[in-house]
């Protein structure tokens, strides 16, 4: 199963959000069985981060473990000392359509 996630960064906080992904989140995703497929910025909105995850197992269980991980809690707290770095997060679960082409 795939998950398309869209984050809107707080004004001026996109560098902090990307740093948290590079320094902490990517390794934590791997630890909890979530595979990063790709990361994008919309061409017309640099304050938005869109990314695609692949889940090997139940996404709900994986997210519960991720959100309870002490390393995640520490990274989140450290990155938000000066306030939240995201204004909103949207998540959609996607399934491939069997009889249509895919590169995934």
Kindly give the residue locations of the regions a language model identified.
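Short, well-ordered beta-strand segments in beta-rich or mixed alpha/beta enzyme
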Residues: 2-8, 37-70, 90-94
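Glycine-rich beta-strand-turn "strand-cap" elements at beta-sheet edges
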Residues: 35-48, 75-104
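Generic secondary-structure transition motif, activating predominantly at the C-termini of alpha-helices
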Residues: 22, 67-71, 80-83
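Short, surface-exposed linear patches
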Residues: 25-31, 59, 72-77, 88-89
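Short amphipathic alpha-helical segments
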Residues: 13-37, 71
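A short acidic/glycine-rich loop-to-helix N-cap element
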Residues: 16-20, 63-64, 77-78
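Surface-exposed interaction/gating patches
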Residues: 1-16, 28, 98-103
């Amino acid at each position: 199963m795939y998950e398309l996630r869209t984050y809107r960064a707080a004004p001026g906080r996109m560098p902090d959000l990307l740093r948290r992904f590079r320094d902490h989140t990517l390794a934590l995703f791997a630890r909890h069985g979530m595979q990063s497929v790709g990361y994008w910025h919309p061409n017309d909105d640099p304050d938005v981060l869109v990314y695609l995850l692949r889940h090997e197992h139940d996404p709900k269980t994986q997210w519960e473990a991720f959100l309870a991980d002490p390393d995640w809690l520490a990274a989140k707290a450290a990155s938000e000392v000066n306030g939240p770095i995201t204004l909103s997060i949207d998540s959609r679960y996607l399934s491939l359509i069997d009889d249509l082409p895919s590169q995934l």
